[in-house]
């Protein structure tokens, strides 16, 4: 199905069904069309049917869950892991605002530890964030958006003075750390394009050496 990857990452991620099965209690509230609905589960089993419990002026879903201590030896939530993921999501979804609040940690003024993540320029700001401690080789981030077979594709990239390749690839917000055809296709396309430009400009004649894809990716940072 050519349309599968419009909504799927092609990976077996941990979704709400998995969280539900591994929680002694999961409480879900849904605000929709002026009404508030609620349902509770225990170890994946509904405790009662979905119930309309009131009215609401909002739209959205609130999920509260308690991990099953008989399965998890330790269930301590680490701020840095959650903050890094929400920061990543804010870059991948330009314009949205995500807030992380830790009610275990109280500030001197009585408020809870909290951080807001928001990015107006998305992937461009993501690349700037990744490369903030590196010396740039070009002034501006290269940003490309296109669509193929109804599936949107977005790339932001730049070069720095290091010798390392630093590429982060995602499918529908999922970090595809093991790569995939989207990543190998990008690498091939980049090599083909830059090599053709170098040949047309007769740059390679002066060097008298064979240029590989690795050479074109030295100092590259891309998302």
Identify the meaning behind each predicted range:
Residues 1-120:
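GHKL-type ATPase core
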